[in-house]
């Protein structure tokens, strides 16, 4: 989500006594907002409590636990993005990075680019293609252009996103000539 906030709903507790149900509330902080594994750097906002509906007789006693001194890690995983593109029919199944016109579903409207060689469609014919009948080949995500909304490719993945690609009809040109004969045909 492009923040260093680790929401309580994203954190799992381990090492509690078997059968005891605990929950966390509020949020903690990581040292980075980018993809990776981090130590949770600030636990001051996290509160341990008995799980909703638990009672002292069920053994869920939050007062018996502390986060101080434990091991606290948090992983930020890559986010799936969607790509789409269009080109005119050219008799090949090739999809070039330059043919990808939209990369969507990024966080905070971050901008990414495409790079690499070619992907392919299952046919060279005019049609709409999707993840099922395309291959990424060597197409990869690349960092977006420098600026306020530059996205880092390392934070995103094409896996799990949609990949839509359309081959449109090729526009033909025509010309002709004839000797003047006063006819319109």
Regions found by a protein language model. Name each.
Residues 2-185:
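Short loop/turn motifs that initiate or flank beta-strands
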């Amino acid at each position: 989500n492009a923040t260093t906030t680790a929401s309580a709903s994203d954190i799992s507790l381990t090492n509690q006594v078997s059968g005891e149900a605990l929950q966390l509330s509020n949020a903690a902080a990581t040292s980075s907002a980018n993809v990776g594994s981090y130590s949770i750097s600030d636990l001051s906002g996290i509160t341990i409590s008995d799980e909703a509906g638990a009672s002292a007789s069920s053994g869920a006693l939050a007062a018996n636990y502390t986060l101080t001194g434990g091991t606290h890690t948090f992983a930020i995983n890559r986010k799936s993005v969607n790509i789409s593109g269009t080109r005119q029919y050219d008799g090949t199944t090739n999809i070039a990075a330059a043919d990808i016109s939209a990369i969507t579903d990024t966080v905070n409207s971050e901008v990414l680019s495409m790079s690499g060689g070619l992907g392919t469609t299952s046919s060279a014919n005019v049609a709409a293609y999707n993840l099922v009948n395309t291959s990424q080949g060597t197409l990869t995500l690349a960092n977006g252009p420098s600026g306020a909304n530059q996205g880092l490719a390392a934070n995103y993945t094409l896996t799990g996103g949609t990949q839509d690609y359309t081959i449109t009809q090729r526009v033909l040109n025509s010309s002709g000539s004839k000797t003047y004969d006063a006819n319109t045909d």
